[in-house]
Structures are given as C-alpha cells and as structure tokens.
Swiss-Prot record:
Record flagged with keyword Signal: no
GO CC annotations, alphabetized: host cell nucleus; viral capsid
Inducing or repressing factors: Expressed in the late phase of the viral replicative cycle.
Record family assignment: Belongs to the adenoviridae hexon-linking protein family.
Annotated site residues (Cleavage) in this chain: 43-44, 84-85
Keywords: Capsid protein, Host nucleus, Late protein, Phosphoprotein, Virion
Name listed for the protein in its UniProt record: Pre-hexon-linking protein VIII
PTM notes: Cleaved by the viral protease during virion maturation. May cause the middle segment to be shed from the capsid.
Note: All late proteins expressed from the major late promoter are produced by alternative splicing and alternative polyadenylation of the same gene giving rise to non-overlapping ORFs. A leader sequence is present in the N-terminus of all these mRNAs and is recognized by the viral shutoff protein to provide expression although conventional translation via ribosome scanning from the cap has been shut off in the host cell.
Any one GO molecular-function label of the UniProt entry: hexon binding
Length: 155
C-alpha cells in the first residue's frame, strides 16, 4: 500500500500550471495584505488592481492573519511562508514566489496526511500517528487488507 517512492502520477493532485508572482517589497502594502488575510492562492476574495484572485490557482498558500516579523523573510530571492530562519533583510530586493500545486517529481517516504486520508479508511484507522506529516514512518499499516476493509490480527 505504501511503497518507498510514490510516482507523481499516482498522487491525488489538481492539474494546474506553474505561476510565478513578483511579491511587492512595499512594507505598507505587505502589512495591509497580511492584516486582511489575503490569499496568494486558493481563490480568496480580495480586490486589488495588481493581483486578481481569478488569476491565481493553488491550495492553501496564504499570508497569516498577523504580520510576520521581518526575520522570517529571507533575502535569497525566496519568500518563505513558514519556517524561516533569522537573517538580514533587504527590502529593496524584489522577491519571487513560485506556485506549483502539482508534483513534478516522485515523492519518497511517507505520503503525507492529506493523501493518507484519501488512501486509508478513517473508520478503520483514523489518526494513527501524532506529530507533523514529515515524522510519519514509511510503512503506515503493513497488514491492512483492502478486500475485507480490515486490519489483519486487529479485533
């Protein structure tokens, strides 16, 4: 059920194209975008002249409802939405954000929580692991029988 490497064609994913956005380095505009919870992808309702929601595709990438500290914005021309480290910040550098919702290379190891819910029946094994999806083991339920919708040896 869970091989060491999942080919990209076997994963449940939307068919979308890659979009690259040039993010503004205007702090006032960024603060306004952040405070209003503007979605960079996912079809959120937000009206501006430069960025139109209908031109954006993707899932779940958005600015938080609070203003992130500038230490989480890295100057290497990569805009990190989460998990940034402390670094210097140069607001004059234009930052690019690449939206690529569909996988282009095979994934290895676990399949993540969303794909896990699609693959396994929640009534049999609803929340088998705690912690972030990256900490899941490679093999989830080695003795799960698809034909009988049960786990072998589990009463």
């Amino acid at each position: 059920m869970n091989p060491p490497a999942w080919p990209a064609s076997r994963l449940f994913q939307p068919v979308d194209t890659v979009q690259t956005l040039e993010l503004p380095r205007n702090e006032l505009l960024e603060t306004a975008m952040t405070n209003s919870g503007m979605q960079l992808a996912g079809g959120g309702v937000h009206r501006t002249k430069d960025i139109k929601p209908e031109d954006l595709v993707g899932r779940g990438i958005q600015l938080n409802s609070y203003q992130p500290p500038t230490t989480r914005l890295k100057p290497e021309r990569v805009f990190q939405l989460a998990g940034g480290s402390r670094s210097s910040f140069n607001p004059s550098i234009n930052t690019l954000l690449t939206l690529q919702p569909a996988a282009s290379v095979p994934r290895s190891g676990g399949i993540g929580e969303v794909q896990f819910v699609h693959e396994f029946v929640p009534s049999v094994y609803f929340q088998p692991f705690s912690g972030p999806p990256g900490s899941y083991p490679d093999e989830f339920i080695y003795n799960f029988d698809v034909a009988t919708d049960s786990i072998d040896g589990y009463a």
